[in-house]
C-alpha cells in the first residue's frame, strides 16, 4: 500500500487531490475525497472517456496518460502522467502564464499556445466538459518549446455522448467551449494588453518569470 496521508498534495480540485507518486517521479496519484458530492461520478465519466481514447488516440502530448489504480492509505488512487518541465520544475498553468505577460513577445507566445491548443483538440477530437485556463498546464519540453496540456474536465457528462462519437458534434461543442474559454478574464485581459517589445532577444517566458 502506498502512503499518501503524510504528503502535502500537489494540487486540490473540487473532488480530487493530486499527490506525487512516491515510487515513480514521472507519475502522480489522484484521490477522490468528495465521493458523495459528484466525485465518484466524475471519475467514472473520466475513466470511461480515457478507455475510449485508449482505443484510438495516437498523440498524447496534450493530455496526461492514465495508468490504472493503486491502493493508498487515502483510498483508491488513480495514476496519471505528471506534467513537469524539462528541468524538473512543475509546469505552470495557463492562468499563471497569462499573468506573466510583460512584453509583445509574451503575448505572441500566448497566442501561439492558444493556437496549438485549439489545433490539438480539433485534430484529435478531444472532448472536454469545459475549458479553463487554470486546468491547462504549459509543459515546457525545452528552452524554446512549450506544449499546452489539458489536465482536467476531460470527457463529457451527457446521457448520450454525441461529441465522443460524432466528429461534427465534437467540433460544434469545441467551438462553443472555445468562445467561453477565450472570454475568461485571465486570457481576455492578457490578450488586450498594450505592451512594448522587450529590448533583449531572449525567449519571452519560461516556467518561472525571469
UniProtKB/Swiss-Prot annotation:
Induction: Induced by low extracellular levels of magnesium via the PhoQ/PhoP two-component regulatory system. SUPFAM superfamilies: Protein kinase-like (PK-like). It holds the Pfam family YrbL-PhoP_reg. GO terms for cellular component: plasma membrane. InterPro entries: Kinase-like_dom_sf, PhoP_reg_network_YrbL. It comes from the Bacteria. This is Uncharacterized protein YrbL.
